[in-house]
Structure formats: C-alpha cells, structure tokens
Amino acid sequence: MDATAYRGLLEEGLASLGVEAEPGGVEAVLLHLDLVREWNERMNLTAITDPQEMVIKHALDAASGLAVAGVEPGQRVIDVGTGAGFPGVVWKCLRPGIDLTLLESLQKRCRFLEEVGQAVIGPLAGGEGYQVVWGRAEDVGRNPAHRERYDLVTARAVAELRVLAEYCLPLARVGGRFLAMKGPSVGEEILAAEAAVEKLGGRLEEVRELELPDGGGRRSLVLIRKERPTPKAYPRRAGVPAKSPL
C-alpha cells in the first residue's frame, strides 16, 4: 500500500469521525493494512483487498467505534472474534495506551495477530498491552482470568445482537461497557435482544448511527452498560448461544 497516497484518506476520514490519532498511529494503521493484504494471500483474512476500500471499510469502520466508546490509557479492552484485528488493532494503533486483548477462535489467525504485535505494536507501544488469546468466547467467558475483567468489550460483524450479548457481556466488569458494531438496520435486532441483555446484566445505553466517509456506508454502534454481574449459567457451552439464542 502506498502510504503517502492513503495517509491523507485515512487522516481526513478520522477527522470526519472526530477521532484523533496519537503520534505514529496513522502509520501503524497503514502498516497493519499492508500486513492484512500480504497474509491474505496465504489465509482468508478479508474479502476486501482494494487499498482504498480497506482504509474506508476496515480502518475507518473500526475507528468509528472510538467516536462512541472513547477509551482511556490503561483501560482493559477485549475484541471478541477479532479476525484480522478489526477493530482492536486499529484501536491500539490510535490509542497505544490501552491494554488490548484480541480473542480469536482460529489458530492460524492468531499467528497473524502475533506477527502484527511484533511488526506494528512493538515499535509503537513497545509490545506492551497487547495479548492474543486463542479460544471461543463461550469458554473464555467462563475463565476467571477473563470473566468480568474488561472495561470495554467489543465485537464487529460477528453475530446477531442477542448472540453477541451472551458472548460479550460476561467479559465486561460491572460498570464496564459492551460496544456492538453493526450494519445500517439494527432496530429489530435490538428489540429481539432486550431480554437477553437484561438477563446477562446489561442495559442499552446508546445507539448511534453514522455514515462512513467516502461512501463507505451506514453503520450502527450499539453501546450497552454492564450494571449487574452476569449469572453463572452464562455463557452457555460452546455453540449453544448461536443455535439457541436467549
């Protein structure tokens, strides 16, 4: 990717979203996108490979989450089902001070994310505050090392909201938040997920709709506050939330 050609697109897009990059952040995001394209030749990381589309539909889409759920240095953040590192890696590039965990169920993608840690996050943040966890959300959500440990839990285009809630809310601390990054039409999903969110200890706090720059499409960002501990029965065993949503 020609960093000079796409740097301006990324910077202008971030400005339009109201997201400010910390020093070195823009360059780090572009390097991450380069690695995604390179590794995509060996494994399935993304169907979007045009450099301009990657900036808009991956980097800026990911960054839009920071416009709604601003994070502070030292806060613990987990990206559930991160895939190629969206939104988590982009957040870490733009906010190097966060303590980021990337949760991914495919081991080969975890290898890619570890390479990103060395090549991108290492030079930017000394490799600090960056962990890759191989596993399924249902299992990790029962692990005391992760359960109710995070200030912010996020997921992008992983599953419908009532399923995502069972994956993600058990990981958020009481008082923490869960940000679901969804497509343009989310109203029915939110209604269908109300009972699940309540059962898991959450409360809908905000739904913000925004338009990605340069015709990137409309997005809905759903922010849920964790108000009570999640009952010990949740998450259910691996595969059950998707097959039988709450």
Swiss-Prot record:
Disulfide bonds: none annotated. Residues 221-246 are annotated as: Disordered. It is found in: Cytoplasm. The keyword rRNA processing applies. The keyword S-adenosyl-L-methionine applies. GO terms for cellular component: cytosol. One of its GO terms (molecular function) is rRNA (guanine-N7-)-methyltransferase activity. Its main location: cytoplasm. S-adenosyl-L-methionine binds at G81, F86, A137, E138, R156. Pfam families: GidB. Its EC number is 2.1.1.-. Keywords: Cytoplasm, Methyltransferase, rRNA processing, S-adenosyl-L-methionine, Transferase. Signal peptide: none annotated. Specifically methylates the N7 position of a guanine in 16S rRNA. Belongs to the methyltransferase superfamily. RNA methyltransferase RsmG family. NCBIfam families: rsmG_gidB (TIGR00138). This is Ribosomal RNA small subunit methyltransferase G. It comes from Symbiobacterium thermophilum (strain DSM 24528 / JCM 14929 / IAM 14863 / T). The gene is rsmG.
